[in-house]
Amino acid sequence: MPEDILVDIKRDYVLSKLRDNERIDGRGFDEFRKVEIIPNVIEKAEGSALVKLGDTQVVVGVKMQPGEPYPDTPDRGVIIVNAELVPLASPTFEPGPPDENSIELARVVDRGIRESEAVDLSKLVIEEGEKVWIVFVDIHALDDDGNLLDASALAAIAALMNTKVPAERFDLGEDYLLPVRDLPVSVTSLIVGNKYLVDPSREEMSVGDTTLTITTDKDDNVVAMQKSGGYLLDEKLFDELLDVSINCARKLREKFKEI
């Protein structure tokens, strides 16, 4: 069967389920797929984690090295987030330099970490104005079955939680745990008409192009927000999505207690 016909069949099936107020996998509209967080999966990294979100899989590795601070923050360490989306993870990804999708993914994850002040960057100063710790957070998509963003955000914070600052390697004292003080969690919803689907799968993404990602910190404060697509949200739907995102984030944050 030609690929385009198969896509149309799947799309029609998703839409028919939505008309019956159902999702194709039986989940509630505000329900995530099964989440599994596995820490310390990359032996040579300072910190790492693998997240499985349904059939979506993302691994994040953290590396650290001394470097110069940004001129406007001489008393703070530096976090740099990168994302790599390779064809192995999805036929829609192309080889080559980072495209706009990987850049946007890295930017949204970075914003959640930065705006929540998840890492105490003031404790990553070696010599103020001269040398600080640079934290490289590298996101690698292994399998994209929808909602790479939330899986990446979970994997990033999980990897940071088990990161050790490699001070001994650089003759800068003893190693110590990266000072993580918050757990930002992002929740992405697909908007289809007057309905929303939390944690959309790849098949569900075929019926709409408008998503809203809301990132909250451990105190339920919104620290980042990202909307894609052209659908205009009314105030009632936005308020509902905000409440749902906060509640989902609370549940996801409980997963960190299991690692």
Curated annotation (Swiss-Prot):
Record keywords, A-Z: Cytoplasm, Exosome
GO MF term list: mRNA 3'-UTR AU-rich region binding
Any single Gene Ontology cellular-component annotation: cytoplasmic exosome (RNase complex)
GO terms of biological process kind: rRNA catabolic process
CDD domains: RNase_PH_archRRP42
Subcellular location: Cytoplasm
Top-level taxonomic group: Archaea
InterPro entries xrefs: ExoRNase_PH_dom1, ExoRNase_PH_dom2, ExoRNase_PH_dom2_sf, Exosome_comp_Rrp42_subfam, PNPase/RNase_PH_dom_sf, Ribosomal_Su5_D2-typ_SF, Rrp42_archaea
Coiled coil: none
Gene3D superfamilies documented for this protein: GHMP Kinase, N-terminal domain
A Pfam match: RNase_PH
Cytoplasm among keywords: yes
Quaternary structure note: Component of the archaeal exosome complex. Forms a hexameric ring-like arrangement composed of 3 Rrp41-Rrp42 heterodimers. The hexameric ring associates with a trimer of Rrp4 and/or Csl4 subunits.
Cited function: Non-catalytic component of the exosome, which is a complex involved in RNA degradation. Contributes to the structuring of the Rrp41 active site.
Family according to the record: Belongs to the RNase PH family. Rrp42 subfamily.
Protein name in UniProt: Exosome complex component Rrp42
Species of provenance: Archaeoglobus fulgidus (strain ATCC 49558 / DSM 4304 / JCM 9628 / NBRC 100126 / VC-16)
Gene that produces this protein: rrp42
